[in-house]
């Protein structure tokens, strides 16, 4: 029950963040609260890790977020320069985001499974 409530609160915060595009302060607050709700959602799973494993996992998460953002930004500029993507920018952008997030999720899951065995 607790996880369901937190899940719907995460969706609500994401919805507020998308709807309030012109209000930057409200959008920033919604993003921070969403991050807190995500941590609450995974609270029980985080208890299985040691402090060292959580530190390593946090560093890897921050590193992969930076890499994922870099891949998405460079992919967007690459798509704007090439004529091949003319008319397909939306589909190519969505595929770029899905592929980069999938790769980062795969790497983070592999690291997480290896740290659970420690």
UniProtKB/Swiss-Prot annotation:
Record gene name: ynzK
Protein name as annotated: Uncharacterized membrane protein YnzK
Entry keyword annotation includes Membrane: yes
Residues passing through the membrane, by range: 5-20, 25-42, 53-73, 83-103
GO cellular component: plasma membrane
Name of a matching Pfam family: YoqO
Source organism (scientific name): Bacillus subtilis (strain 168)
InterPro entries attached to this UniProt entry: YoqO
Annotated keywords: Cell membrane, Membrane, Transmembrane, Transmembrane helix
């Amino acid at each position: 029950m607790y996880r369901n409530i937190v899940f719907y609160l995460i969706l609500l915060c994401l919805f507020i963040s998308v709807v309030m595009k012109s209000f930057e302060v409200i959008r920033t607050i919604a993003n921070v609260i969403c991050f807190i709700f995500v941590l609450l959602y995974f609270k029980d799973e985080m208890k299985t890790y040691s402090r060292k494993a959580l530190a390593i996992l946090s560093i890897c998460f921050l590193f992969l977020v930076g890499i994922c953002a870099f891949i998405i930004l460079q992919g967007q500029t690459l798509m704007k320069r090439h004529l091949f993507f003319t008319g397909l920018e939306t589909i190519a952008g969505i595929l770029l985001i899905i592929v980069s997030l999938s790769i980062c999720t795969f790497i983070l899951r592999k690291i997480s499974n290896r740290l659970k065995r420690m």
